[in-house]
Amino acid sequence: MAHNKIPPRWLNCPRRGQPVAGRFLPLKTMLGPRYDSQVAEENRFHPSMLSNYLKSLKVKMGLLVDLTNTSRFYDRNDIEKEGIKYIKLQCKGHGECPTTENTETFIRLCERFNERNPPELIGVHCTHGFNRTGFLICAFLVEKMDWSIEAAVATFAQARPPGIYKGDYLKELFRRYGDIEEAPPPPLLPDWCFEDDEDEDEDEDGKKESEPGSSASFGKRRKERLKLGAIFLEGVTVKGVTQVTTQPKLGEVQQKCHQFCGWEGSGFPGAQPVSMDKQNIKLLDLKPYKVSWKADGTRYMMLIDGTNEVFMIDRDNSVFHVSNLEFPFRKDLRMHLSNTLLDGEMIIDRVNGQAVPRYLIYDIIKFNSQPVGDCDFNVRLQCIEREIISPRHEKMKTGLIDKTQEPFSVRNKPFFDICTSRKLLEGNFAKEVSHEMDGLIFQPTGKYKPGRCDDILKWKPPSLNSVDFRLKITRMGGEGLLPQNVGLLYVGGYERPFAQIKVTKELKQYDNKIIECKFENNSWVFMRQRTDKSFPNAYNTAMAVCNSISNPVTKEMLFEFIDRCTAASQGQKRKHHLDPDTELMPPPPPKRPRPLT
């Protein structure tokens, strides 16, 4: 780690918890003014801020125990000049729980301090104030205050949510002070744990921190969250699809997807579109694009890695194994594809009143280890048809693939010239699609890019533009006012509430859940729970959607722009209302788009 760099995941980690057992205050490390150039004012945590917080509580802290392995984060003199004794107790923390010697030293110095200064708090911090900090505080509660380990862990989690989140720390506590078989599973990781895109998970001394529940043999891998009980497809039972929760297979699949995409961050590596607005719509005139309908489906990447080794990866980076789904090699139908990564979405078609799950493939990143993701998008579409779809159909003709035994069907999703956009939305095509569609996707013809892609544009009718929030229902009131429930809406990477929503009887069940909301009549309105997502939209994404809501590209504007782009490509002069120095022009008469082929 660079000597002047802020610790990974520190920025939006909460500064402090609540006092534990009236004796301890858990907090993250403070950063001195030397780091201000890297930290926005609202995210700073100077030593002086700790002093101001203690004064607001009208409590005195007499001792601060620093568990980190460095002295670079802040000047201890800034602590000591406030009358707080400072002690450095180095704990490794990189995949290692505090040793017995660390624990004995911590308990001894805290006990001695409490005997001499019983009313004063002891502050404890590691880098983030959760695992090493929680471990040692819990050990003290058990050894010196006769608490059960269950009560100690639960109390710390209430004071510093979500508590100790490393499974090996919890197991070690229960091994020392209880029954290791009764150790609880680690809680869901908080959003701030997934915010850095560095490829190395370094802590304060530059060492790599191991991942919970994973093998160190995977090398330079980011910490990946495990969501137990993930649902594959909401509202439909799909036989033959089971979640992968055990190592090493889980980590191997996640790592392979990351490597194939060239993704150095954590979490889902797939390309993510942005909302179309009056600025980025101009990209349609600057580079070649294809268009397809936007299905209201569930995003999945598919890793094909040999016979009975087909896996689906969702936006939470959860992994599912798919049985009885075969992808033969075109040149030899007896062989099975491997080292192949697809991108697409699961949709539910309604056929004769029955729900039929299908996987629509709309991109390919690797084909039998070949980096086809670097090819032109048109080439990739041909690859999907020729190498993925056609060989399956050929083998079905021989009777060697029984489609009725497959958990879901597989199809390729076609893309068209952008001049067909009107027909996709308004023609018979829209009526013939047997699943929900809520807009259009405009795909540039360049190579595949993982993560947020500012040139992949999604257009939705203004009435359907939405944001995925985390809902937190809070009881609020004021002087002369009756307390009432308020729905606070949070987005990723932003500590304060982004917006509010009226709390109804229906909404109460979604407290602390991810909900999709639209903006209607000057207020946010609940649409549905997003069971396929564990995190809200990022702040920048939410702001982009809000911009498209307040300043939307209407269907008429979109059609006009595309018509004029088409005219320009045919050598005709064009001028449209989104160009600078032009006035709003009425929509041109409808043109008959080229047939969809």
Swiss-Prot record:
One of its GO terms (molecular function) is ATP binding. Residues 229-597 are annotated as: GTase. One of its GO terms (cellular component) is nucleoplasm. The active site is at C126, K294. The keyword Nucleotide-binding applies. Isoform 1 and isoform 4 (at a lesser extent) are expressed in cerebrum, cerebellum, thyroid, lung, heart, liver, kidney, spleen, large intestine, testis, skin and muscle. The keyword Transport does not apply. It catalyses: a 5'-end triphospho-ribonucleoside in mRNA + H2O = a 5'-end diphospho-ribonucleoside in mRNA + phosphate + H(+); a 5'-end diphospho-ribonucleoside in mRNA + GTP + H(+) = a 5'-end (5'-triphosphoguanosine)-ribonucleoside in mRNA + diphosphate. Residues 181-220, 570-597 are annotated as: Disordered. Its EC number is 3.6.1.74, 2.7.7.50. Residues 330-386 are annotated as: Interaction with POLR2A. One of its GO terms (biological process) is RNA processing. Residues 25-183 form the Tyrosine-protein phosphatase domain. Its main location: nucleus. Residues 1-212 are annotated as: TPase. Keywords: GTP-binding, Host-virus interaction, Hydrolase, mRNA capping, mRNA processing, Multifunctional enzyme, Nucleotide-binding, Nucleotidyltransferase, Nucleus, Protein phosphatase, Transferase. Changing E234A: No effect on GTase activity. InterPro entries: Dual-sp_phosphatase_cat-dom, mRNA_cap_enz_bifunc, mRNA_cap_enzyme_adenylation, mRNA_cap_enzyme_C, mRNA_Capping_Enz/RNA_Phosphat, NA-bd_OB-fold, Prot-tyrosine_phosphatase-like, Tyr_Pase_AS. It is found in: Nucleus. Pfam families: DSPc, mRNA_cap_C, mRNA_cap_enzyme. GTP binds at R299, R315, D343, G344, E345, K458, W459, K460, R528, Q529, R530, T531, D532, K533. In the N-terminal section; belongs to the non-receptor class of the protein-tyrosine phosphatase family. Bifunctional mRNA-capping enzyme exhibiting RNA 5'-triphosphate monophosphatase activity in the N-terminal part and mRNA guanylyltransferase activity in the C-terminal part. Catalyzes the first two steps of cap formation: by removing the gamma-phosphate from the 5'-triphosphate end of nascent mRNA to yield a diphosphate end, and by transferring the GMP moiety of GTP to the 5'-diphosphate terminus of RNA via a covalent enzyme-GMP reaction intermediate. Interacts with POLR2A (via C-terminus); this enhances guanylyltransferase activity. Binds (via GTase domain) to the elongating phosphorylated form of RNA polymerase II; can form direct interactions with the phosphorylated POLR2A C-terminal domain and indirect interactions via bound RNA. Interacts with SUPT5H and RNMT. Interacts with HIV-1 Tat. (Microbial infection) Interacts with HIV-1 Tat. Isoform 2 to isoform 4 lack mRNA 5'-guanylyltransferase activity due to disruptions of the GTase domain. This is mRNA-capping enzyme. It comes from Homo sapiens (Human).
